[in-house]
Amino acid sequence: QILDDHAERYRELKPWQYCGSVYKIAASGKQTGRAAGTWNTMEINCTGYHYQVRHNGILIVNATLDEFPELMERRLEGFLGFQNHSEEVWFHDVRVGLPLAP
């Protein structure tokens, strides 16, 4: 999930709706986003059903199947896509491959 956590209109979301969360499953532990209009970094590592999300260098999700059995509903193969509901969002240096070193 990518979202401007600081926007007033998003202040009453469910925990799993904030930036970096595995949507509807694992909430990001911290709100580490920079202000809208500045670059943020996000690294997502999925190894089987182990999901790790680093936002601006901080580990905010470390979800395993033991803790979140709902991860079993996620496919292990398929397409990677970006979805946008209406706001402008920019991406750069998008890479897909083996996990980066910690």
For each feature predicted by the language model, list its residue ranges.
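Carbohydrate-interacting regions of secretory-pathway proteins
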Residues: 1-102
